[in-house]
Amino acid sequence: MHYRFLRDSFVGRVTYHLSKHKYFAHPEEAKDYIVPEKYLADYKPTLADDTSINFEKEEIDNQGEPNSSQSSSSNNTIVDNNNNNDNDVDGDKIVVTWDGDDDPENPQNWPTLQKAFFIFQISFLTTSVYMGSAVYTPGIEELMHDFGIGRVVATLPLTLFVIGYGVGPLVFSPMSENAIFGRTSIYIITLFLFVILQIPTALVNNIAGLCILRFLGGFFASPCLATGGASVADVVKFWNLPVGLAAWSLGAVCGPSFGPFFGSILTVKASWRWTFWFMCIISGFSFVMLCFTLPETFGKTLLYRKAKRLRAITGNDRITSEGEVENSKMTSHELIIDTLWRPLEITVMEPVVLLINIYIAMVYSILYLFFEVFPIYFVGVKHFTLVELGTTYMSIVIGIVIAAFIYIPVIRQKFTKPILRQEQVFPEVFIPIAIVGGILLTSGLFIFGWSANRTTHWVGPLFGAATTASGAFLIFQTLFNFMGASFKPHYIASVFASNDLFRSVIASVFPLFGAPLFDNLATPEYPVAWGSSVLGFITLVMIAIPVLFYLNGPKLRARSKYAN
């Protein structure tokens, strides 16, 4: 682990301030540091500095550089611009930038192993809290007995957890984009609260209290899911971003399936309450590890801190940072608009976002519906034990991993290499893979439903579930990348916040009616066939959505006031 990981971690920052900058000092605070002339109090801007950064006219990414997706926007091409802007004198202010294109303090210049370790940490964090969504579901029967409630009510804690991490991004995503807060402090503080909440959740003695605690747990679990992709983008070059996001999202997509796997073992060996003690332990371990090893990577926050250090060293109050300039111009009204209204406006008014939200919400809901459907067949028909039922969820993980190993080399061939060859690459490059994912998703649902009968081997439904999961992974990856490449940087946070809220609300209600849907459509020979077929026909129709984007993507983006 590199020294800067500890220096810029939560513990490192606290130690730095408590020791009055004696420990974990930064390069600018070294005795032999030579302050660049432009930061000195008596520095006079020359004609060469006249082309200053215009914060209102030019979108700047979180590394303090012109945003790649904003450049060359006239031809709707995805391009990259990693050139540092050396023109950093803005009127009477001196805007702090990186010390050259190869500044080692810039996370995008970290060595590959350090980037990989950072992405692993974000993925582990996501997995350690995200498995909490369905971790207790193997113990629902025991929960129903203890609290004297029905199945639908016993499913409410799952529903409210999912709603919680749909609402959370409306609060935490804007905070993580503010230079004062950054990403790491939000990760650590919310993770600490999540860990603490697992204690009363494990001890609560009524369903109302359990539901409230589960909602709060989901709310404080949301930053890693909502901001994890942005953290990956902090350290990964633009042309490698789809690969980095795929690596991180393995934890996000596989996490809910790990929950029932461990939950089934704990329920059999102890009780449903121990599923929450397990969450306390695993997320607590994650908290301790990340306190020491998770560095800040948000460029605006790092430059904000650098500006503060340079002001202290030089006594020059003209020194500022991009983040400080943005905060000084942000009004309370603008903050409310960006945080609460714009995600809703974009969802309703943008056809591209609305259609993607509907499709992804459906796919997301199907994955959560498996937590209700698997017991109907594997326990009710094949008489699996609870632990054996837990292992069946690993078929979802296997399907996702296989899809990732196929997706990464394909996307490198179709996206990364053309960009490195300086060829034009359009957002629609992701869509053919999404169409393939849609076909796999639909095929998997039909395979799962019609192979799950009383006479065939149970491996058939597992193959169908794995195929469904593979398709879901491809749809998630490609449509998220398509949205990220299609909209202006200023609106990306609102676009994804709307998606988080929309898909979480829709997915949260599916487990409530999942079992009744399959029970009402069941036949003696095929207990889940017709229920799966209903979902299969719906997803078959929805394949038209990526096909529409592939045929008319540029036209749809041209009509949008938010798109590139």
Curated annotation (Swiss-Prot):
Induction: Constitutive, high-level transcription is commonly observed in laboratory and clinical strains of Candida albicans that are resistant to the antifungal drug fluconazole. Multiple cis-acting sequences within the promoter mediate its activation. One, a benomyl response element (BRE), is situated at position -296 to -260. It is required for benomyl-dependent MDR1 up-regulation and is also necessary for constitutive high expression of MDR1. A second element, termed H(2)O(2) response element (HRE), is situated at position -561 to -520. It holds the Pfam family MFS_1. Changing residue 318 to A: Leads to general drug-sensitivity. Keywords: Antibiotic resistance, Cell membrane, Cycloheximide resistance, Glycoprotein, Membrane, Transmembrane, Transmembrane helix, Transport. Changing residue 306 to A: Leads to general drug-sensitivity. Its main location: membrane. Residues 60-101 are annotated as: Disordered. Residues 137-151, 205-206, 264-273, 372-390, 450-455, 525-528 are extracellular. One of its GO terms (molecular function) is xenobiotic transmembrane transporter activity. Disruption phenotype: Leads to enhanced susceptibility against fluconazole, methotrexate, 4-nitroquinoline-N-oxide, and cycloheximide. The chain crosses the membrane at residues 116-136, 152-172, 184-204, 207-227, 243-263, 274-294, 351-371, 391-411, 429-449, 456-476, 504-524, 529-549. Residues 67-86 have a biased composition (Low complexity). Changing residue 322 to A: Leads to general drug-sensitivity. Gene3D superfamilies: MFS general substrate transporter like domains (1.20.1250.20). It is found in: Cell membrane. Changing residue 308 to A: Leads to general drug-sensitivity. Changing residue 329 to A: Leads to general drug-sensitivity. The central cytoplasmic loop (residues 295 to 350) is critical for the function, but unlike other homologous proteins, has no apparent role in imparting substrate specificity or in the recruitment of the transporter protein. NCBIfam families: 2_A_01_02. Belongs to the major facilitator superfamily. CAR1 family. The overexpression of MDR1 is a frequent cause of resistance to the widely used antimycotic agent fluconazole and other toxic compounds in the pathogenic yeast Candida albicans. Plasma membrane multidrug efflux pump that confers resistance to numerous chemicals including azoles such as fluconazole, voriconazole, and benztriazoles, as well as to benomyl, cycloheximide, methotrexate, 4-nitroquinoline-N-oxide, sulfometuron methyl, cerulenin, and brefeldin A. This is Multidrug resistance protein 1.
